[in-house]
Every structure is written in structure tokens, then in C-alpha cells.
């Protein structure tokens, strides 16, 4: 059972055509590029991939296409989380059939389950599959925070092996690291907290900004893990404006805007997400110019 999905995992955008249908050909090209530019793994149809507005059929085809393109060269992690346990089980099983390496399960949103409800949800999905599972905590979107004690309970299940922690709470991450067994990997879900999470023994990051500077983020991680904390800090501070600038409005609007400015025609976001405002687009353009990315 793999628990190491790599240090740098990119939460991949979903490219759309002008009519907002999924652009599977560009998905292939982007997946190749991300792996070539430093990504050890890819999350497909996660938050950054606009999972709420993708159909089940689109998700499964995205999983299949990315496995076909980069399977064996990078870890392919399917976003199969839902606020319906039965739907999450069904999509996880479909993802397993097309050959993904792992699945990522977001904390169920909107219906606000208790900690016991969260435990039962994730346990049920885990029992339905042989795939390794990465939990995904993002209370700013789900309105529910999975507590370190609940994660520790779930870590006793063989195929629940990692968590993407995007709550932005370093105290919570510290408590997770204290309670969790060796081999259970904690990933930062925030680009700007990658280095702090590494300092607490975290594994790496599930990144958005790696679409733009994957190689440089990999250099930062490698510097830290090899003991060159001075260089790691220098790279972190260099990239910090980009880490913050890609979240000036709802993700993935800024990163899709940035990719478009860099020549990647990944298309707009599906409604109800709106495009970047003129002021936001100008801010992103200025940031990319200052980083010499365009």
C-alpha cells in the first residue's frame, strides 16, 4: 500500500473548450507538462479541477485520460469525495477500474456531519476499495473541520494513508503530527504553508502554484529536505507573492487566468464561478511580469 505520493503534487485545473466542454486533448498536454516541470503526482477533479461542476462521466474520463498519459511516471490521484457516502463509494470504485493510483476524499460539505459521521463516512469508502486514500480537510469550503483525533482514528485503517490539510492552522497540523503514526503523510493544502508544514515533518504540498513554477517549488522542497534551510527560505520568500496572488479571488479563477496569460488556453471556469475582474486580471498580469513568467 503506497502512502508516498511524492513531495510535490499538483491539484490540476480542468481545461475547457470555448463552449465549456472538457478539453481532453489539452488535459493530456497539461498533465505531461506538469510532470515534466517537477510534479511527482497529479490530483484530477479536485477543487482546483472544478469538481462541483463536473459530471460523473466527465470525472471518470478525466481519470482515464490522465492515467493513460502519465500513469507510471507520476502518481494519479482521483478526486472522488462527495457529501454522499454512497456516491463517493461509487465514484471511487469507478476510478479504481480505470487505473488511478489513489483517491482523495474531501470532508463532506454542506450537510455538516459530526466527527463520528466523518469517521463512518471515510471508513465506509475505505472498505469499498483497495486504493490508498488521502483525506482532504478544507473547512473554509466545507464548513466542517476534521479534528486531529478523528484523523488519528482513521489512520488505523490500512488504506487511509495521508491527509491534505488546508485549514491553515499550524497548531492543528502540529497536533496531527503528534498523534499520527510514522508513515502517515501530512501534505500542506496551502502553497504559502509548504515550508512551515515541512518543518513539522510534513511530506510536501498539494499545490496550485506548481502549474506556474513547479520546478522552483520542487527546488525549495529539495533544499529543505537536504538540510539547506537557508536556500529553502530564500525560495519561499521569492515565491511568496505568487503563493498569495493566486488566491486573490476564488481558486481556480486566478491560476486559470495566469495560465491563459502564459499561453495555455485552459478556458474559463464553469458557472457559478465568474471570470477574474479587469482589476484582478491586471494584478495577475503584473505579478507574472514581476516574476518573469510572461
Swiss-Prot record:
Pathway entry: Amino-acid biosynthesis; L-lysine biosynthesis via DAP pathway; (S)-tetrahydrodipicolinate from L-aspartate: step 3/4
GO BP annotations listed: diaminopimelate biosynthetic process; lysine biosynthetic process via diaminopimelate
Site residues (Part of a proton relay during catalysis), renumbered to this chain: 47, 110
Where along the chain is pyruvate bound? 48, 206
Q: Which CDD domains match?
A: DHDPS (cd00950)
Task: Please provide the record's keywords in A-Z order.
Answer: Amino-acid biosynthesis, Cytoplasm, Diaminopimelate biosynthesis, Lyase, Lysine biosynthesis, Schiff base
Record-linked InterPro entries: Aldolase_TIM, DapA, DapA-like, Schiff_base-form_aldolases_AS, Schiff_base-form_aldolases_CS
Catalytic reactions of this protein: L-aspartate 4-semialdehyde + pyruvate = (2S,4S)-4-hydroxy-2,3,4,5-tetrahydrodipicolinate + H2O + H(+)
GO terms assigned for molecular function: 4-hydroxy-tetrahydrodipicolinate synthase activity
The free-text function statement in the UniProt record for this protein reads: Catalyzes the condensation of (S)-aspartate-beta-semialdehyde [(S)-ASA] and pyruvate to 4-hydroxy-tetrahydrodipicolinate (HTPA).
Task: Family membership, please give it.
Answer: Belongs to the DapA family.
Instruction: Quote the protein name from its UniProt record.
Output: 4-hydroxy-tetrahydrodipicolinate synthase
